Structures are given as C-alpha cells and as structure tokens.
Amino acid sequence: MQGETMSKTYHFIGIKGSGMSALALMLHQMGHKVQGSDVEKYYFTQRGLEQAGIPILPFDEKNITEDVELIAGNAFREDNNVEIAYAIKNGYKFKRYHEFLGHFMNQFTSFGVAGAHGKTSTTGLLSHSMKNITDTSYLIGDGTGRGSANAQYFVFEADEYERHFMPYHPAYSIITNIDFDHPDYFTSIDDVFSAFDDYAKQVQKGLFVYGEDSNLRKITSNAPIYYYGFEENDDFMATDIIRTTTGSNFKVKHDGQIIGEFHVPAYGRHNILNATAVIANLYVAGFDMALVAEHLKTFSGVKRRFTEKIISDTVIIDDFAHHPTEIIATLDAARQKYPSKEIVAIFQPHTFTRTIALLDDFAEALNEADAVYLAQIYGSAREVDHGDVKVEDLAAKINKPAKVVTVENVSPLLDHDNAIYVFMGAGDIQLYERSFEELLASLQTHM
C-alpha cells in the first residue's frame, strides 16, 4: 500500500472531526499528501493540522478531482454536503473514516481500544508507552495522530457508535466497559452488548476486558480473553493501590506473581483500570514490563480529559465527560488531586436524546460535586429539539441548588472560595470556560 498511494493526495471531507484530523496527521507524517475541507468555525483539532501545514479548505465541489482519494466524515451526506453530493453524482468513490481504517490497519500488528468510556485516555496511555519502546503509529480520539513510515505497530481507538468498529480486525483489543449510551442509535443495553460482542469476535490474538463489568464477563471471542480489574478472579489484578495528590501507585498480579510496580501521574480509580488494561495487553504481547513502567510515569494525558490550567490562582479543569459514569469518574479524580478544595461542577448536557434517557443518572452523578452549575443543552446536528426536555428539568432533580449560567454571564461562579472548577461536556462548554477565564483575568487587572 505504501508505494501505490504515495503519489495520491488524500482529501478529507470534514477534516476537523477528531478521528479525521488524527488520521490526516498520521498519514501526513507517513509521507502522504493530505488536505481537507470543513466549516469555517474554529474547532480544537485544527491547531495540529495548521502546525503540520495541512491545507484546510472550505467545502466546495472543486475540491473533488480525479487525483484525490476521498475519505468522508460520518456526519456528511449527500443532503448536507456539496462535496459528497458532487462525488456521488459524478461517480467518484469515497470511503468513510472507519472503512478506510479497517483496510489501512491490515499492514500492521494492530492494537484497538473500545468501550463506552475511557477509550481516549486508554488509547493515549497505550500509544505513549509503545511509541517510547518501539516504532508505533497511532490514532487517538482527541484528534492526535502520529505516523511513522517504519512502524510495525498501530494503536487506534474503536468507536461503537453506529457499529463503526465493525470493519476492524485487530490483533489485540481492550474493551474498557459496556454502558448504555448513544440512545439516538442503540435501543437498549442489550443492543449495545451485541455490537461489542460482534466486535470481540473479530479480535485475533488477545482480548482484554474489565472483569468487574457483568456484560463484559459474557463477551465471547475466538481470541483468548483476559480479564483485568481489582478482584482476585481477574487474570491481571491491580493491587496495593496508593492514591495521592501526585497520581496513583499500584502493583499488577498475574498468575499469582507480581509482574511489576507502576505509577501513573493520573487521578481517579478509572485511570488505574485503564493503566492495568494497557499493562495486561503489553505483557501478553511480549513487551518488557520495566520499560512499560518507566514510560507510564511520563504520560501527560490526552486533550480534553482532565486538562488543567491555572488562571489568577484559580484551578480550572476541562473534561469531555458527557455521560453520568464519566462525570462520576472526573469528579472522583478531582477529589483525589484536590482533597481540601470545594469541587464546583459546570456541566453542559450533550444531545436531547441522551439527556432524556439518562436524566436521573445525570442528577445522581452531579450530586457528587459540592456545587453545580448547568449550561443549556447542546443539541447534536443529528437531532431536532422537540421541547421534551430542558436543562431546568435536570436542575430540579439535583439535590443541591443548581443554577443555570449563560456564556454572557458566568459571574455566579465567583461565589466560591477555595474552589476548583470542573467544566464538563462534549458540546461548546469551552465557550463558558473561556468566558470564566476572561472574567477572572479582568478581576485580576482591576485589583
């Protein structure tokens, strides 16, 4: 594949999408010619593309020519995108992101990471460890991609939405958990399970699943299945756990033997599990545990997952959490790192369908914070607001006063001393965060 496609230009329709931008960066670094098109609006992935010198064009049918290979983002269709419409009308073939990836990964020993939650952090941890030990290409769902022309290994994130992971047949895969999400597509937890079960059957050499997840205990695969977790009946067990304000220390036991002592500079119980999954996979794949331990220590995290900054002596955390399970994990991490601080959560629900389906669970998760503020629901491009749910409905279910804030007025957040602020959501919650940062900075200048 290397030789036959080097002369082609890959054109990405919707290049700012997190998976798409990561793939574009990876192909660029492998020596391929890459360009893409998208909307004008700023998205956090575009900085990496711009730094790499990858052209980002407006959507235009002129971009579709004989000499480009087309890769199309999943959200773009004939009825909402001029380039797709032009390609279909004129007989130009294109592959969806996941179709292209399924074909592309066959030239490597591939490591997949699937699961309802924790995919991106775990993919980041796995690729960080591997790239420091050997030549590895990878794609992370935070928009980060790295390509190496000599890589024999490929690490990627596998997304269950609309069963997008079905073209993938990895050598190894981790599945972090199974949970009901994407209610606009999946009808029930059983429907979600069947998708993961189908994916598991395509894994070839080893499947690593969280042992305390009752659904994952029912998963079947043609490859050997290894369970990881905190219990004695797991094949790889995290033990002797010490959680501190600088991260988490633990040992991993396999077949009654300690295979290594590890430290991750990450917070929350979920990150110990993510690291244990990575350790289990690399142990079975024959990697040196001393090297794995060495590189886990230097993992700096992935974009929009517990990303911290300090503005005017105030700690602000940005996180992609948009499901109750993720909110609980993020707040747990915040408490570990800042045990003496008030935890203020600012949450923006993402999609009306998810908010309706999980309203009570969201309220319960947000109860873990000391104070709660809510932003207006961020609707997806795939849905229409029928007025069936409002953010005030969520506020009413939270067992402490939950105020609704706007981008224009985030001043109620100033009512807290000795607090850290955790902004969570998958929509445009970063606009609220930026507004709060500007407010803090302006107060500083007037002091």
Swiss-Prot record:
Q: What Pfam families does this protein's entry cite?
A: Mur_ligase, Mur_ligase_C, Mur_ligase_M
GO CC terms, sorted: cytoplasm
What name does UniProt use for this protein?
A: UDP-N-acetylmuramate--L-alanine ligase
The Enzyme Commission number assigned here is: 6.3.2.8
Q: Which family does it belong to?
A: Belongs to the MurCDEF family.
Instruction: Kindly tell me the pathway this chain contributes to.
Output: Cell wall biogenesis; peptidoglycan biosynthesis
Superkingdom to which the source organism belongs: Bacteria
Q: Which Gene3D superfamilies match?
A: Mur ligase, C-terminal domain, Mur-like, catalytic domain, NAD(P)-binding Rossmann-like Domain
> What is the purpose of this protein?
Cell wall formation.
Write the record's keywords in alphabetical order, separated by commas. ATP-binding, Cell cycle, Cell division, Cell shape, Cell wall biogenesis/degradation, Cytoplasm, Ligase, Nucleotide-binding, Peptidoglycan synthesis
- List the HAMAP family hit by this protein, alphabetically: MurC
Q: GO:BP terms for this protein?
A: cell division; cell wall organization; peptidoglycan biosynthetic process; regulation of cell shape
Note the SS bond partners: none
- Which subcellular locations apply to this protein? Cytoplasm
Amino-acid positions noted as binding ATP in the UniProt annotation, renumbered to this chain: G115, A116, H117, G118, K119, T120, S121
Q: Which NCBIfam families match?
A: murC
Which reaction is catalysed here?
Answer: UDP-N-acetyl-alpha-D-muramate + L-alanine + ATP = UDP-N-acetyl-alpha-D-muramoyl-L-alanine + ADP + phosphate + H(+)
Q: Name one GO molecular function term.
A: ATP binding
